[in-house]
């Protein structure tokens, strides 16, 4: 299993993405909701993989909820970068491929557009359990 790294601009939130997939094979999705479009989100995840979200400063993790309020959108409070989103008490995560160190391998590929406006909260959670990666949060002291 390979480990890939990424972070927000200031480095307070970083990602270790463990997957058997090489970046050229990462599934790419573009949610068409206003929030994701405004943040140029390029979603990726691997249900067989795992993501460790490392908090260099736990105060830097800003959680934002809207719409069905079942998802925490993870934004760095210091630099404003949207790194991903979690559901079910941080059990599942999707990451923003644009924050990964290997993002150049993702750009230029066609992402699957997703319109999810008609999903109920229960349907969203079920879909995310199937598509998103397992998540663990590691809060480290300075």
Region annotations inferred by a language model:
Residues 1-7, 12-142:
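A short Gly-Trp-Pro
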């Amino acid at each position: 299993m390979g480990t890939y790294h990424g972070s927000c601009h200031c480095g307070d939130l970083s990602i270790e993405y463990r997957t058997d997939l090489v970046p050229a094979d990462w599934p790419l999705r573009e949610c068409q909701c206003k929030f994701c479009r405004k943040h140029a989100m390029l979603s990726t995840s691997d249900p067989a993989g795992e993501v460790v979200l490392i908090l260099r400063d736990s105060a830097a993790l800003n959680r934002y909820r809207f719409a069905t309020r079942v998802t925490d959108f993870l934004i760095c409070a210091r630099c404003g970068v949207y790194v991903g989103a979690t559901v079910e008490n941080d059990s599942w995560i999707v990451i923003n491929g644009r924050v990964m160190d290997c993002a150049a391998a993702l750009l230029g590929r066609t992402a699957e557009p997703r319109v999810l406006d008609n999903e109920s909260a229960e349907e969203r959670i079920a879909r995310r359990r199937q598509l998103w990666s397992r998540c663990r949060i590691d809060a480290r002291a300075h």
